[in-house]
Amino acid sequence: METVDTSQRLACLRELMKERKVDVYLVPSEDSHQSEYIAPCDGRREFISGFSGSAGCAIVSMTKAALSTDGRYFNQASKQLDNNWLLLKRGIESMPTWQEWTAEQLEGGKVVGVDPSLITASDARSLSETIKKSGGSLLGLQENLVDLVWGKDRPSRPSKKVTVHPVEFAGKSFEEKITDLRKELEKKKSAGFVVSMLDEIAWLFNLRGNDIPYNPVFFAYAIITPSTADLYIDEDKLSADVKKHLGDKVSLKPYTSIFEDAKALGQSAQAEVNGGASDPPRKFFISTKASWSLSLALGGENKVEEVRSPISDAKAIKNDAELEGMRACHIRDGAALTKYFAWLENELLNKKTVLNEVEASDKLEEIRSKQKNFVGLSFDTISSSGPNAAVIHYKAERNNCSIIDPEAVYLCDSGAQYLDGTTDTTRTLHFGEPTEKERKAYTLVLKGMIAIDTAIFPKGTTGFSLDTFARQFLWKEGLDYLHGTGHGVGSYLNVHEGPIGIGTRVQYSEVPISAGNVISDEPGFYEDGNFGIRIENIIMAREVKTTFSFGERPWLGFEHVTMTPLCRKLTDPSLLSDAEKIWINEYHNEVWEKTSGYFEEDELTRNWLKRETQPI
């Protein structure tokens, strides 16, 4: 990870700020759809700061610059930021939030500028209130100043073809999904829903794209009313098959006309009020993640209602076809990972091959690509050896990465997009003799992963409540990890999917776990400069039978679908309970039963799998 000299970029940005009478300028990570993962053309925060992580906000004043990010990226940011930048570590008590730091720069009635398409309406209101206390004000600038600094070197916006996602994998037609959405909107007396999140649009219309790396989505907006369905998309992205799929039930409109139409909808709603209609006017709904600019186009906070997206809620509860697809693709994916780990061990120990982290991950992609229904990777593979494994979201660069050390911990976090599902698996291995500390750390993390997997809890329980199940064994030793325990996973969609998850984020306390949710289970431990441990399975929430049923409500548990062995060499059986040993042995028996058939003619992998799945 190289440090980028940002001095000239900051100087140019400050000149533009001065011209526009802006004292502080905000550069969020997200695009105009509030996507976590973005297209290269939207990488403004990375361009101005040099920090390439997926989360964070850059704040630039006329004399200072700060970058705020969460615990996943503290190590990475400290390496990538040059001396122009102060790192604000989110969640650390001694550190101000980026909003507080911004307010500190504003004495004397200064102005904070931001592109209103890159910040949510609720965040804009909250920030405005914070900076008002320091005498400052928030100004939305329609032209993005970082884009002006970037100039002709900024990548162009992708315009790749959209494809139909077959109903055999989707499990429900797009017409049924729109009908369900309309019923939900009618219950809440809404005039309609303006859809801005890209994965929600892809899911709703049973379409997939390729505009953002690793995420099968496409740039679009949609407006759904009781009688109309409008899709705002560049028409050259649509094939004849896609147009036939949508038929006459969906009106196609230019992507750029969304704000003009939103403004017209807002004015139409106001006209109804002025006309003296007897019933209260129905408001349009937008997601709480919709942009400030979209809210303003519809008339502002008094004219629209910001809600947790009903599409997000529906999408998170997978139907039977999606759940079956998840089971199937994880078996194939687990077989690919097993083949890769067997190959890697053989290359390092028997052939004494010198491999770097990227060469190894390239081999994994090659193996995966041969699996049925493979489309591509679901995120950049984290292939990390030794101290690099302590960088939670490490990215090995092709011309600047480490040789894999057989005598050090190797952490591999990887996933793929298949037509029938999305995978995300982490395994930590050791090809030599691990230290006692490495074995203890691994086993404590494993115990936490098993605790989530085997949890039984009443309906209505949130991921916030479950988080301590995973951390308890580390906490007893005074250890912890600075990331969430689990995130929602899409079905041939984004590998990080809301609104559910397991962790300490406020949002995880708001939405309970429901049957049909697909979530990662991935506790970890990281010792900077030395090693990192993470173990990740994908689990699916389901109703379970219990001896009793207190409160006469359903009880839930999890079904794991990830099928690749855990690391025997790093596991210390003396730290495991009898129940945990039984779980590991049963899990490994399941892995053998479901994946060994892939290796009937592959003796190397079959022998490795048999060895790794023996009872402990």
Swiss-Prot record:
It is an enzyme of class 3 (hydrolase). Keywords: Aminopeptidase, Hydrolase, Manganese, Metal-binding, Metalloprotease, Protease. Its cofactor is Mn(2+). One of its GO terms (biological process) is proteolysis. InterPro entries: Creatin/AminoP/Spt16_N (IPR029149), Creatinase/aminopeptidase-like (IPR036005), Creatinase_N (IPR000587), Pept_M24 (IPR000994), Pept_M24B (IPR033740), Peptidase_M24_C (IPR032416), Peptidase_M24B_aminopep-P_CS (IPR001131), X-Pro_aminopeptidase_P (IPR050422). Binds 2 manganese ions per subunit. One of its GO terms (cellular component) is cytoplasm. GO terms for molecular function: metal ion binding; metalloaminopeptidase activity. Its EC number is 3.4.11.9. It holds the Pfam family Creatinase_N_2. Mn(2+) 1 binds at residues 424, 522, 536. Mn(2+) 2 binds at residues 413, 424, 536. It catalyses: Release of any N-terminal amino acid, including proline, that is linked to proline, even from a dipeptide or tripeptide. Catalyzes the removal of a penultimate prolyl residue from the N-termini of peptides. Belongs to the peptidase M24B family. This is Probable Xaa-Pro aminopeptidase P.
